[in-house]
Curated annotation (Swiss-Prot):
This is Chromosomal replication initiator protein DnaA. It comes from Staphylococcus aureus (strain NCTC 8325 / PS 47). Residues 1-71 are annotated as: Domain I, interacts with DnaA modulators. Residues 115-331 are annotated as: Domain III, AAA+ region. The keyword ATP-binding applies.
Length: 453
């Protein structure tokens, strides 16, 4: 693939993973200049954006690049102005343009601090009511790996600080023991490496790499749902590490019991230690995050502008910091001082037309389950008793009506059921709605509640 084709694919995947605001503000107009010696040089016309992408999104883009090109590539975002210096350096010291060898890639799986964002430490983590317990648990684990809580399972929505805490744990462990072997990875990357090890007949090297360590930090574990072989491999990796008193830290967007198509033996192991959840920051925490950010960056922003951002952006920390960066870029490009009016103008696309919360199948299962007294896990179970089967059909019907997910995807979230089962459920509930006005009112009430989640 050409650089253009590679980056088009990266942007396509990134658009699905990032919020619309983050994608359009920071990543949309970037361009891949070259890939050389395991590094992807990516151009951004705005200095603020280049710095922000290196700090906050390099890890996500690195994982996507791995999926697209099939080997480890570290993204480095530079401005178009910096490109001249880069080109001069390349001319002075020409480098070989070969793909990294397998040996180099494998050796780089344990990279110490290079795995972690230098900014993501416990010192830079702003504590508030929504994250105080996860922070305390993470610090306890970092102080005494495998002695406090093992595993530590952190869950919460996107951009709330789960990855920050995992990086902070990694930094702290290495502060106390520079020789510790620490791996930070995502379950998606773990899966891709596992598949590659099978393809290249390198299973033993893969197992050695992940089992001969002191701390495993694995992000977004929900990605392994429905991946039977990956779950089995991770099960044995988990057992090996746990039995040898090695620390395991796991993050997810939902608690273990709500991860569909996760083997019971893995689910139970995830629940062995401590499960903590991170919730969106309150106003005071949002203000503290913004104030800390401007102190770190030595920025001069009036308090009323920060107050406006903190009041308007309530979803997560990533969106909050993204709004601040957007404001700085807007002010710089227009050459105008930052005021409340300019802040409102810079963020008008976010504020005036907020993207409504996307309804998930998990939202539907939760509301329907509460109404009919059905546990979340029962929606994925094989049970066919009417007290469970009928609410399951209602949830399938609502999933088709209220989401854009495909029939196979809906079936997957209900225990891996075939798409024809979803069609049958939709047809049956549609028929019952026409025949029973009381039932119709019941389902309409459920729909309203789901839309208000």
């Amino acid at each position: 693939m050409s650089e253009k084709e590679i980056w088009e694919k990266v942007l396509e995947i990134a658009q699905e993973k990032l919020s619309a605001v983050s994608y359009s503000t920071f990543l949309k107009d970037t361009e891949l200049y070259t890939i050389k010696d395991g590094e992807a040089i990516v151009l951004s016309s705005i200095p603020f954006n280049a710095n922000w992408l290196n700090q906050q999104y390099a890890e996500i883009i690195q994982a996507i690049l791995f999926d697209v090109v099939g080997y480890e590539v570290k993204p480095h975002f530079i401005t178009t102005e910096e490109l001249a210096n880069y080109s001069n350096n390349e001319t002075a010291t020409p480098k070989e343009t070969t793909k990294p060898s397998t040996e180099t890639t494998e050796d780089n799986h344990v990279l110490g601090r290079e795995q972690f964002n230098a900014h993501n430490t416990f010192d830079t983590f702003v504590i508030g009511p929504g994250n105080r317990f996860p922070h305390a648990a993470s610090l306890a684990v970092a102080e005494a790996p495998a002695k406090a809580y093992n595993p530590l399972f952190i869950y919460g929505g996107v951009g709330l600080g789960k990855t920050h805490l995992m990086h902070a744990i990694g930094h702290h462990v290495l502060d106390n023991n520079p020789d510790a072997k620490v791996i930070y990875t995502s379950s998606e990357k773990f899966t891709n490496e596992f598949i590659k090890s099978i393809r290249d007949n390198e299973g033993e090297a893969f197992r050695e790499r992940y089992r001969n360590i002191d701390v495993l930090l694995i992000d977004d574990i929900q990605f392994i749902q429905n991946k039977v072989q990956t779950q089995e491999e991770f099960f044995y990796t988990f057992n090996e590490l746990h039995q040898n008193n090695k620390q395991i830290v796991i993050s997810s967007d939902r608690p273990p019991k709500e991860i569909a198509q996760l083997e019971d033996r893995l689910r139970s192991r995830f629940e062995w230690g401590l499960i903590v959840d991170i919730t969106p920051p309150d106003y005071e925490t949002r203000m503290a995050i913004l104030q800390k950010k401007i102190e770190e960056e030595k920025l001069d922003i009036p308090p009323e502008a920060l107050n406006y951002i903190a009041n308007q952006i309530q979803s997560n920390i990533r969106e909050l910091e993204g709004a601040l960066t957007r404001l700085l870029a807007y002010s710089q490009l227009l050459g105008k001082p930052i005021t409340t009016e300019l802040t409102a103008e810079a963020l008008k696309d976010i504020i005036q037309a907020p993207k409504s919360k996307k309804i998930t199948i998990q939202d539907i299962q939760k509301i329907v389950g509460q109404y009919y007294n059905v546990r979340i896990e029962d929606f994925s179970a094989k049970k066919r008793t009417k007290s469970i089967a009928y609410p399951r059909q209602i949830a399938m019907y609502l999933s088709r009506e209220l989401t854009d997910f495909s029939l196979p995807k809906i079936g997957e979230e209900f225990g891996g059921r075939d798409h024809t089962t979803v069609i049958h459920a939709h047809e049956k509930i549609s028929k019952d709605l026409k025949e029973d006005p009381i039932f119709k009112q019941e389902v309409e009430n459920l729909e309203k509640e789901i839309r208000n989640v």
